[in-house]
Each structure stands twice: as C-alpha cells, then as structure tokens.
C-alpha cells in the first residue's frame, strides 16, 4: 500500500470517501472491503460505544481514523446531532498543561467522549510518529474534526464530507491541524448548527461541488447562493423533491470524488 501524505489530492480524497462510505456497512463488511488483496490493510481495529463507531487502519507509515456518520435509526446519533448547546473544549493530547480554548458542540463532544479513552490508548501505542489522517461523513465528520483537535498533531490531516459546524470561532481558530472540507451543493447538514448562534466551520481548503458536480475551490457566499437557487429549482421542477437532503448522501460524495479523480488522471 502507498503512503498517504498530508497534501490534498483527489486520490487521497477518494480513498477517504471510500472509507467513510463503507463505515456505514458495519465491522464485517468494512474489514472485508479493506483487507482483501495483496495491498489490503492487515491491521484494522474497530471501536464502538454508546452509538459512536470508529475504525482505525494502521501500517508502518500511516495511521487512519474513520468515524461512522449518523444512522437515522439510532437515537444516540440523533441525540448527538441535536444537542447544540456549546461547552468548553477538552484538553489536547499533545498540549498537556495548555489552557483549553474555545467552545464545542455538546452532543459531538459527548459522542467522542464515549470512545475517547480507548482511541487515545490505541493512538499512543500505534499512531505516534506516523502520518495521521482522520475522516468521516455527517456526524462522523464532526467527530473526525474534534478527534484531530484533541490529538493536536500539527501534521495531521482531516478530510470531512458533509460536515456540520462543530464549535465557535475561538475553537476553530485555535485548531492546529489541516482540514480539507468537501461539500456537495445544497447539503443541508453543512449549514447546521446555524452561524447566528455562534457556530463556524473548520475549513482550510473547501472543495465545493456545484449543482452540476463541478468543483469550486474556496468559499464564496454569492456563488454558493446562486447554486442553491439553481439546485433547488432544478430538483423541485424535475424530481419534485428538495435536494438539500439528497445532496447529503455519502454515496454521492464518493461518486463525485471518483469522478474528479478520473478527470484529473485523464488530463495528466
């Protein structure tokens, strides 16, 4: 297996999307998908507690953490999503003695706490000194962001798909890692909790897929508003549905990343 670095690439993004997609399929299917073949991952660990589920893949050079996203039928997941009230953040692992700065979404913090101790032990035994990559979709994206913040490895990288906002500006400004945030057009989850109650995104490099699946790099409120109108009108007229929920599909994120990777390889 090749080493994954901390620079953004569509090859890395597609692999992270594949991981996040299969995290919904349960432990057995996940292991089957990523351990097969001569280039399969031989060391895959699974952790679960209180509704929070996480896979960790390790090799000599990489340490990859994958959080499962929201299961609509799981009360624990729904409860984590709707607890908007902010609390002070946890201390970062590699910043012992440093005052914690910023406030974090209470539900996401509680969901990560359910599994934090065992994840921290595993990281200390198997992850230090390796390139850390963290990923997830929806609730999983929020947990991936907070996990990377707590580990506090400045070289770590987080790929998030359809991530909600996780905390206030002070929290985000003091996060010491790189986050590549991917958003599919009108994905409604990326707009909650709302900005007007003090939430913001961790996003060092936004990759925004417009209504036609074309990538726009960076944040532009005007451009995205235009795409919101276009996407909403198109789906209401054509499909009689609202695309805000359909655009949150992890399957669509995976397809969009693969399409971009193929396009990039053809151009090269």
Segments the model singles out, each with a brief description of its role:
Residues 1-135, 139-268:
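Non-catalytic, mobile gating and regulatory segments of ester bond hydrolases
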